[in-house]
A protein has these predicted regions:
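RecB-family 4Fe-4S metal-dependent nuclease core
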Residues: 1-239
Length: 239
C-alpha cells in the first residue's frame, strides 16, 4: 500500500497478456470455483466469455490509470465508518454510518474515492438537495460515494474527490471518473473538493435520519414502483 504507480509499470503490465490472464484465473479460482490456486478447473462456454469480458475490463481500467499516472495507490476494499447521534422524540440514538470503498488513490493533494461500476451511465445530479428528494432518477450511487467522501473529509487532510468509475466507459482519452454536478443544459462542475458540499450533505443526511427514526412520521411506501424491482425488502412489504 501507499505505492506510487508509474507509467512504466502499467505499460509493462498492459503488454503482458499472460500475467493479466493469470490475475483473472486467480480471481475465478478464489471467488467462483472456490478451489486452491494449485488446481486447474475447466471453464465452460459462459465462463470463458465472462473471463474474456473481465480481461477486457481490466485492460480498460489499466489504460485509464495509465493516463492518470503517476499517482499513489492508497488502498482497496477499505472499510470506513463514523459514529453519529440521531435526535428522536424519545432521546438520542447512537448509530454508525459507513461502508467499503472500492479504491483510494491520491495525486497532487487530492484523494480520490473510487467506486467501480460495470454497467449503466454516469449520473449527474443537479445539486446536493436532489440526492435527498424522492424521484425516479435519484442517484443512489452518487449518494453512497458522497457519504464516503463526507467521512473521509474528517479523517485526513487532503481534498476529497468522489468518483464513480464506469469501467465500460473508461476507454476514451478524456474520461474522468470524478462525479460531476449541474443543472440540465448547463455546464457541469466536477466535484474535485467535496468540502464545498460537505456541510449541506451532512445537514440533509441528519434530517433524513431523524425522519427515519421518528415514530411520529409514518413509514410510507415509495410511489415510484420501478424502485421496487431490485429492492431487498420487497418480500416484507409484499409489493
Amino acid at each position: 500500500h501507499n505505492n506510487v504507480i508509474d507509467k512504466e509499470t502499467l505499460e509493462a503490465l498492459l503488454h503482458n497478456e499472460v500475467k493479466l490472464q493469470d490475475y483473472v484465473d486467480v480471481a475465478f479460482k478464489e471467488l467462483f470455483f472456490n478451489v486452491s490456486q494449485d488446481e486447474k478447473p475447466e471453464y465452460n462456454g459462459v465462463q470463458l466469455i465472462n473471463s474474456a469480458v473481465i480481461s477486457r475490463y481490466l485492460k480498460q481500467l489499466l489504460e485509464n490509470d495509465l493516463r492518470y499516472t503517476p499517482f499513489t495507490f492508497v488502498g482497496s476494499e477499505q472499510p470506513v465508518q463514523e459514529d453519529i447521534e440521531i435526535k428522536t422524540p424519545k432521546g438520542i440514538i447512537k448509530s454508525r454510518i459507513g461502508g467499503i470503498i472500492d479504491r483510494l488513490d491520491s495525486k497532487d493533494g487530492t484523494l480520490r474515492i473510487v467506486d467501480y461500476k460495470t454497467g449503466g451511465d454516469a449520473d449527474t445530479p443537479p445539486n446536493v438537495e436532489s440526492l435527498f428528494t424522492p424521484a425516479k432518477k435519484r442517484s443512489n450511487y452518487v449518494f453512497q460515494t458522497f457519504l464516503y467522501a463526507a467521512i473521509m473529509c474528517r479523517k485526513q487532510p487532503l481534498k476529497v474527490a468522489p468518483s464513480l468509475l464506469y469501467i465500460h466507459r473508461a476507454a476514451t482519452e478524456t474520461y474522468s471518473p470524478v462525479i460531476q454536478m449541474g443543472e440540465s443544459r448547463k455546464p457541469k462542475e466536477p466535484v474535485e473538493d467535496f468540502s464545498i458540499y460537505e456541510t449541506e450533505f451532512r445537514e440533509r443526511l441528519q434530517v433524513l435520519l431523524e425522519d427515519i427514526f421518528n415514530p411520529e412520521i409514518p413509514f410510507t411506501q415509495t410511489e415510484i414502483v420501478e424502485k421496487c424491482t431490485y429492492c431487498d425488502f420487497k418480500t416484507l412489504c409484499k409489493r
